[in-house]
């Protein structure tokens, strides 16, 4: 279900979700599914058509299955102004990256 938000609210939500993802609190698939459903209010079929991939590939990404190429991941996140990149595996390093101080 699409939630009506201002541009500022959407940006704030996106930043919070990205922080959760970097800290390992939500998966890449969970992030994408939340954005697709709650920000855009789109079905998998319509979103897959929008970004130019198959619905099956989108399902696999949202369920954290398979091993998609970086280009595919970049395609599915592009409508949100996000691309894939390297991120620390260890939570304390991710926290340092986000906050700028060691814990």
Predicted regions: what is each one?
Residues 28-29, 39-40:
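Flexible coil/turn residues that form the inter-helical turn or adjacent wing/linker of helix-turn-helix
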Residues 69-89:
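DNA major-groove recognition helix of helix-turn-helix/homeodomain DNA-binding modules
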Residues 1-27, 90-103:
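N-terminal flexible/basic segments that precede or flank functional cores
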Residues 36-37, 48, 77:
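The alpha-helix within a helix-turn-helix
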């Amino acid at each position: 279900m699409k939630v009506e938000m201002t541009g500022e609210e959407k940006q704030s939500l996106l930043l919070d979700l990205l922080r959760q993802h970097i800290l390992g609190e939500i998966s890449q698939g969970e992030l994408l599914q939340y954005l697709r459903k709650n920000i855009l209010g789109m079905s998998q079929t319509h979103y897959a058509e929008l970004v130019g991939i198959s619905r099956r590939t989108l399902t696999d990404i949202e369920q954290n299955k398979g091993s998609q190429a970086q280009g595919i991941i970049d395609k599915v996140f592009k409508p949100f102004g996000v691309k894939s990149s390297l991120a620390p595996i260890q939570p304390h390093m991710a926290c340092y990256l986000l906050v700028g101080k060691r814990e």
